[in-house]
Amino acid sequence: MSIKPVVALIGRPNVGKSTLFNQFTKSRQALVADLSGLTRDRQYGDATYEDKAFIVVDTGGIGEADDGRGDIDDYMSEQSYTAIHEADIIVFVVDARAGMIGADAEIGKFLHTLGKPVYVVANKVDGVHDSAPAEFYALGLGEPYPMAASHGRGVGNLLEVLTADMPSQENVVEPRGLKLAIIGRPNVGKSTLVNRLLGEDRVVVFDMPGTTRDSIYIPYTREGKDYVLIDTAGVRRRGKIDEKVEKFSVIKTLQAIEDSNVTVIVIDAHEGIVDQDLHMIGYALDAGRALVVAINKWDGLTADQKNYIKIEMDRRFNFIPYVKVHQISALHGTGVGNLYPSILRAYQSSMFEVSTNRLTQILQDAVTANPPPTVAGRRIKLRYAHIGGHNPPVIVIHGNQTGSLPKSYQRYLENQFRQVFKLEGTPLNVVFKLNENPYANKSDTPTKAKTQQLRQRERNRAQKFTTKDKPRFTNKDKKR
């Protein structure tokens, strides 16, 4: 998997951006939807066209006024502004029925300053004159693409042009090695940690096909082990960046997490553990990625501050007791070297292999030590277990009445597997499957009474044959 190009849909409210989003993604299920404090005005979805793949962003509406007065900041929400800057391609959606109004012109002027490909979509052309889209030539952004997104008309033509220069997913060449993503809020020291991790190693820096302009893969070797560092902090090394662009970038973080084997989340010790840090940990866990936490700028704290942060870690990280937390100074290198053993253990845990026999034995040992509860007088039986996947590891347990197994007992089994196999830093998915009954939900289930009835019926038939179907000739007839 490579990091995909990003296409942002922008425009005034109610011009059809969400409808076009659904046409692109062919689903109403967004990759990320309404994450508190982060994506209030945006949702993200995966889109494909032929052998091309990209991420589409549906931004909030821009421009409530229609008099053309004021500058772009009067029209644009902060979240939409950020989405536009993190996109590779802009699709500017306008309303062909309403015609061009002042807000459209202001947005058009702003788009001219970005230096990014912009495609103007004149939506809602159904029921208007064929010449209506021509009005939007005045934006100076090229030919408007006529569309009726609600009916899917014109969507294919736009996708063909939009994806023309995107790389084929079949031809993307991935670098080899453990993929390591460094994520965190702005100014927590990600760039400093990246440089410290790379050290003086000879590295090859290159832009992979299909990556966003702000993310690069950096292959390097340390102690004979190949790594690929996914760097999303590169945008901050390109001179002065507008303050609004420096806001937390959800999409770059999500892409880095999805494409990684292990994610290192960097937290600023001076600011403490904030909700956004926990959101990012949640992203990594939801994606099933192995995780290591680095509390940066630790050496700048007083003894009292360090004690306070340790108490906060115990309180706020209590839902991830299996994740290793390191106190480091990326600037001075203190504790950075200790990250590597934790990264490797987390990766090995996420990819661990074990035989079905061994896994089933561990399951039976756990059940013997602490049997499952009874349901309606019958004890739940867990019969065998096997590996069902990696990164994250999946353990599949088969048995009867598994749907009635309490959450507390499921956690007990997960903890038993973690302890026995020493799994560190990775989520573990334990899946329960019900043994299939071929007679389930059928009216002819063979109960004991029915079986007896069937046997009696067969005996009756045999008796009828012996009494009614006697031979039609006698021994006397045989002699003839």
UniProtKB/Swiss-Prot annotation:
Pfam families: KH_dom-like (PF14714), MMR_HSR1 (PF01926). GO terms for biological process: ribosome biogenesis. GTP 2 binds at residues 184-191, 231-235, 296-299. Residues 455-480 have a biased composition (Basic and acidic residues). Residues 438-454 have a biased composition (Polar residues). GO terms for molecular function: GTP binding; ribosome binding. Residues 5-170, 178-351 form the EngA-type G domain. GTP 1 binds at residues 11-18, 58-62, 123-126. Belongs to the TRAFAC class TrmE-Era-EngA-EngB-Septin-like GTPase superfamily. EngA (Der) GTPase family. HAMAP family: GTPase_Der. GTPase that plays an essential role in the late steps of ribosome biogenesis. This is GTPase Der. It comes from Psychrobacter cryohalolentis (strain ATCC BAA-1226 / DSM 17306 / VKM B-2378 / K5).
